[in-house]
């Protein structure tokens, strides 16, 4: 009697997705896409005029994915062109240059632009965002460190990657994880899969770390008025210590923030009788 042959697993259905790139001009959006799709780096800067469009096919698990990529110009001049392309998007590559603080600070503005153009019925919770901290090869000029970028991304539930379009570092990992997350989204009824990144720390912890980073002096860091008493300083310190202690807080940058708070308390108490 012949042994029964094992059944061949049916390949998954093909999937078509739309991906857009967002970020200021000259942060490397086009170079990241070229590095992945064409395996090359273009050193000469050529500004994207309006929108560049490309199609690529990738294999994710057992599914063939046809990716429609819309590389959007970062110049404000092209806003009237960009605003037509935000709708029906499954994935966003959000890029900033680690050597340009203004490009990092502009990420919130880019999200606001997208939210506005999606309209009241648009839902950004059902889109996968991958944040690329690009040009990490330019270490001498870096002014946005990894913990600051990661904190911003993970506090919003976004994926975060350190990338270099020039060397290729982090590019393949980013796209593979990005596409996998989009497939999970599509298979999950259009709902963004839980990355567990935003659930690992609270908004209060993230906001406090940002505030400490930008504080102008030790008083400001502890959140007390100049001339505060020893008891007021200690009370403010204890509250921050409980919130940010590395044993209890896993938010990126929490350890440095905790050390800064300890140093601020020490400095203030030296001058308070």
Curated annotation (Swiss-Prot):
What Pfam families does the record point to?
Answer: DnaJ (PF00226), Ras (PF00071)
UniProt subunit comment? Interacts directly with MAPK1 (wild-type and kinase-deficient forms). Interacts directly (in GTP-bound form) with MAP2K1 (wild-type and kinase-deficient forms).
**All residue ranges annotated as the J domain in the record:** 217-273
Q: Which PANTHER family match?
A: RAS-RELATED PROTEIN RAB (PTHR47977)
Keyword list, A-Z:
GTP-binding, Nucleotide-binding, Nucleus
Q: Which gene encodes it?
A: DNAJC27
Primary location recorded for the protein, binned into one broad class: nucleus
Region feature (Required for interaction with MAPK1): 1-18
Localization: Nucleus
Q: What is the recorded function of this protein according to its Swiss-Prot or TrEMBL entry?
A: GTPase which can activate the MEK/ERK pathway and induce cell transformation when overexpressed. May act as a nuclear scaffold for MAPK1, probably by association with MAPK1 nuclear export signal leading to enhanced ERK1/ERK2 signaling.
Sequence positions that bind GTP = 23-30, 71-75, 134-137
Picking any one GO molecular function of the record gives: GTP binding
Family of the protein in this entry: Belongs to the small GTPase superfamily. Rab family.
What InterPro entries is this protein classified in?
A: DnaJ_domain (IPR001623), J_dom_sf (IPR036869), P-loop_NTPase (IPR027417), Rab (IPR050227), Small_GTP-bd (IPR005225), Small_GTPase (IPR001806)
Asked whether the UniProt record includes Transmembrane among its keywords, one would answer no
Question: What name does this protein carry?
Answer: DnaJ homolog subfamily C member 27
Q: Name one GO biological process term.
A: positive regulation of ERK1 and ERK2 cascade
Show the PROSITE patterns listed in the entry: DNAJ_2, RAB
- Identify one Gene Ontology CC term for this UniProt entry: nucleus
